Amino acid sequence: MALRHKSAQKRHRQSLKRRMLNRSRKSTIKTFTKQAVAAATTGENLAAAQSKAESLIDKAAKGSTLHKNAAARKKSRLAKAINRVKAAQQS
């Protein structure tokens, strides 16, 4: 990349740092979401796992890693998945 100006170079460095932070946060969200769904199947620590996943999603939305609507959608889908697993276990 031909970044000739100091400010452009700095913004590029900042964008790379921000990208890595965002990728890390999104990866963590995916990991804890999967753990919450897995906890629903085993039945242990479900409330804590779901709470942790939703907390991470909210923090990502607050810090502009995720859009607020995307965060709401992820939380909704997480709750649906957990409820689906619970219903399957009861029947």
Swiss-Prot record:
Any GO CC annotation of this UniProt entry: small ribosomal subunit
Keywords tagged on the record: Ribonucleoprotein, Ribosomal protein, RNA-binding, rRNA-binding
Single GO MF descriptor: structural constituent of ribosome
Region (Disordered): 1-26, 67-91
Highest taxon listed in the record's lineage: Bacteria
GO BP field: translation
Function statement: Binds directly to 16S ribosomal RNA.
Family to which the UniProt record says this protein belongs: Belongs to the bacterial ribosomal protein bS20 family.
Name recorded for this polypeptide: Small ribosomal subunit protein bS20
Organism: Deinococcus deserti (strain DSM 17065 / CIP 109153 / LMG 22923 / VCD115)
Higher taxonomy: Bacteria, Thermotogati, Deinococcota, Deinococci, Deinococcales
